[in-house]
Amino acid sequence: MLREAAALGFTHAELSHGIRIVLLPGVIRAVEEGIIKISSTHNFCPLPTGITQAAPNLFEPSVPDRREHEQWLRHTKRSIDFAAQVHAKVLVLHLGSVNFFWFNPGRTLKTFVRRHPTVSVPDDKAYRAVLKKACEKLRKRMGPYWEQVKASLEEVRAYAAQRGVALGLENREKFEELPIDDDFPALLDSIAQPHTCGYWHDTGHADIKQSMGMLDHQLHLEKNAARLLGFHLHDVTPDGRDHQPVGSGHINFEMVSGFWRPHHLLTLELSPRVSRDDVIMSKQRIDALIGQRFGG
């Protein structure tokens, strides 16, 4: 896999949340032989023993259950250790979700859209009213989950700092997932020193949230620009499929590229079903934007 990425012209790769333990010897060998460098990894990497497919939300830092929290902490620390071992600069993290047991207001939004296929979402007045009420319910219920997220970060911030691994807190695409997008600046400002935490921006997730009326993609980047560590770059098609080739959807990557800085990590995060030619095309489009942004 890493050899194939190198053959396509990539000098760096992110190790995803789908790396099984049996793959580690080959990964480490590829790094030691200089075939490719690892820029970032994604929690949990490697996967917990016995898990054979991607499972970034297997254990959540928002869950107050002691046993699940201990598993999250154990495997996150192991992921930090592995990131340091392969000289990755950033470990990308999900921060969990709010559990609604019986009634998830996010489903209300989906139901409204399904029952009103001709309305213009997110601008429709009735939709905006449903969205406002749903967001109020999310805020009302999130308190203990949000406090648990902050406590969980407190348990790993110094551990990561000691190992020179930055923690990239990723924006998410589902209604109930944390953080609520407006809360990133306050969260990052509240973390005690020393810490390496920063904001990790996923273009597809932001676009999906924008289509729901929950954020403005450009304004969201402006608010978090000073805290950015890197980007997951992928497009979203008009029917809402993300992790698609750059240029195949409606994301304004020229706008996104305006927020890139030389120290940022840029990762193409494409679906495994994307063809080799589309991977190459996506790389070429990002390379062209890098050239426009930084010259050369």
Language model features with spans:
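Histidine-acidic metal/acid-base catalytic patches
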Residues: 1-6, 21, 34, 78-93, ...
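N-terminal pre-domain/capping segments
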Residues: 1-80, 84-88, 107-126, 144, ...
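Acidic-residue sensor for enzyme active/binding pockets
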Residues: 14, 170, 269
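Residue-level "edge-of-site" marker
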Residues: 18, 44, 96, 173, ...
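Short, basic/glycine-rich phosphate-binding loops at helix/coil junctions
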Residues: 56, 128-132, 232-237
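Active-site acidic/histidine proton-transfer and metal-coordination neighborhood
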Residues: 61-198
